[in-house]
Amino acid sequence: MDMQSRIRQLFQASIDTKQQAMDVLAPHIEQASQVMVNALLNEGKMLSCGNGGSAGDAQHFSSELLNRFERERPSLPAIALTTDSSTITSIANDYSYNEIFSKQIRALGQPGDVLLAISTSGNSANIIQAIQAAHDREMIVVALTGRDGGGMASLLLPEDVEIRVPANVTARIQEVHLLAIHCLCDLIDSQLFGSEE
């Protein structure tokens, strides 16, 4: 197969996955946006975490809220737990890599805050511990997962929201996660500041 054919094949696979996910995920993305808006209206904040590409997604979400998405508006409180290398490495060294997010959540999380927990497999041990810590702090969890939801899915409480991409290929799951994050940012902005024509 020549390279351009492979590129077209990858584009088509991404398009197909997004089309399959659209109707399945729309109600969950809507619900997650409402949970986040409710938290923000009640002086809560967003914490986010993930590993690898999902860490990048956590940072992307946080930056869109703190800075701006597609319009001028006030900054919104959001912290990506993936950015402080000194904190992450000290926790990993002194305790365990599995605690790099949970220890931060126990310090920073407050009742009514929201944790955006991202894992394509749903089985990342440090994300599972982050969810447990968020529940201990009376936070609501929005979980971005894929495949069968993994161990994360079984931890979620009725007030939590899972956005599970119906796919098994990591790259396709990540692509839908990014689109879901952009949808969340758009919906948060429109609910807080009104729709832009």
Curated annotation (Swiss-Prot):
Q: Supply the EC number(s).
A: 5.3.1.28
Q: MF terms per GO, please?
A: carbohydrate derivative binding; D-sedoheptulose 7-phosphate isomerase activity; zinc ion binding
Q: Which UniProt keywords apply?
A: Carbohydrate metabolism, Cytoplasm, Isomerase, Metal-binding, Zinc
Where does this polypeptide localize? Cytoplasm
Which amino acid positions bind substrate, per UniProt? Answer: N51, G52, G53, E64, N93, D94, S119, T120, S121, S124, Q174
Reaction(s) catalysed by this chain's protein: 2 D-sedoheptulose 7-phosphate = D-glycero-alpha-D-manno-heptose 7-phosphate + D-glycero-beta-D-manno-heptose 7-phosphate
PROSITE patterns xref list = SIS
Give coiled-coil spans as residue ranges: none
Q: Does the keyword S-adenosyl-L-methionine apply?
A: no
| Record's GO cellular component terms | cytoplasm
UniProt cofactor note: Binds 1 zinc ion per subunit.
Task: List, alphabetically, the PANTHER family matched.
Answer: DNAA INITIATOR-ASSOCIATING PROTEIN DIAA, SEDOHEPTULOSE 7-PHOSPHATE ISOMERASE / DNAA INITIATOR-ASSOCIATING FACTOR FOR REPLICATION INITIATION
Protein task: Catalyzes the isomerization of sedoheptulose 7-phosphate in D-glycero-D-manno-heptose 7-phosphate.
- Additional detail: The reaction produces a racemic mixture of D-glycero-alpha-D-manno-heptose 7-phosphate and D-glycero-beta-D-manno-heptose 7-phosphate.
UniProt protein name: Phosphoheptose isomerase
Q: Which organism is it from?
A: Pseudomonas fluorescens (strain SBW25)
